[in-house]
Amino acid sequence: ADQRFIWNSHALTELSQQPELSRFCLPMILGYVSVNSIKVNGKTLEYVLVSRRSIYRAGTRFNVRGLDLQGQAANFVETEQIVMHGSDVCSFVQTRGSIPLFWTQKANLKRLPNPVVMDIDHMQAFQKHFDQQVYVYGNQVIVNLINQDGPEQVLEKKLAQVVTNAQNENIRYEPFDFHKECKKMRWDRLSILMERLKPDMKKFGYFMELKGSVVKLQGGVFRTNCIDCLDRTNVVQSLIAKEILQEQLVKLGLLRSEKELQDQKAFDAIFKNVWADNADVISKEYAGTGALKTDFTRTGKRTLFGALMDGYNSVIRYVKNNFQDGSRQDAMDLFLGNYIVEENEGLTVKSPLESARDWKYYAVPVIFLVAFSMFMVSVLLPDEHLSEQMLYVLFWGMACFLTLATMLLFGAIFVDQPKLAQNKVKSD
């Protein structure tokens, strides 16, 4: 099994070291698996989608970003699309992974904290990352979907600079400002990106085995990212997968032309829902909610209801990313063996989980609750003297504003921060 994707490898360590017990070790992946039996023009085929999350630099949305010193990327996921018809098999692999630089985006109570590119040399880790990727998958096309203006601009400029300086003939860089190109729900403009990627699709090809003989091999992959490698990434990956799938079905003799797939309504519906479900699962594992923009993946168009659901999921993400993800990160680090509990920890040795909170963590929210309560009382309870009531409203309203401003100013104090492996790295 590929060690990059065995999530219970740490739990199996002692068993795997004993030859008589190693055969009982069952490797487990974290990701998404879907197997569907579908008919196309009266012929049955199996459509399979498998996504596997890497155990390296694993974690939650704002706690792990970019690369580590070994060149491992946060939220790295390998997705393989498999089609089986009788003894014939086709597959196509894509990857996603955090922007391959040293950067952070720490939760601080703001809806979207500004990303920060570290002022250190990125080249060595970048080259390590792509040396690994080229060795495993072949040539790489970096499909970068982040904004080319605003807070994300610093990441796009730095990545373009590093790719240029690397001068690696096995890597091609393809930036595409998803939000700018598709603003006002003009998602049909994604066809611009697909046209730019078609030469690479032809060049890379896909795996094909006919009657037990391998007739084609995939020569490279598309490594797609947005800032989270979730919502925009999944939309583009599903479009690339569909382009390849159409060609595969023609080669297998199941379709007469590539355009015919859109007429296979049942298959088209399953394809869209499988990719949307894949998006939701990968998103929940990293960001805590289902993916955004899945209405486009499911229906082929952007809808008002989908936009409203995106707003709802964004609120849930905000709460989880700021107030729950530290504990989730600690749980992952414990499970993966990134943090090893010391003997007598919590007894004679202090546990990192016992670290004390800053006094502001308790005082400021209490002050806000008191101020907000008094503000509501001042607004709702009538007073004989209107000017006096207005004075109370203004005073307690200002108190609410100042305490909220204080919470935002010291936002990192109020966020649920990881306490185990993350702190150990900092102390080292």
Residue spans for each PLM region:
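Phosphoinositide system proteins, centered on phosphoinositide phosphatases
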Residues: 1-215, 244-428
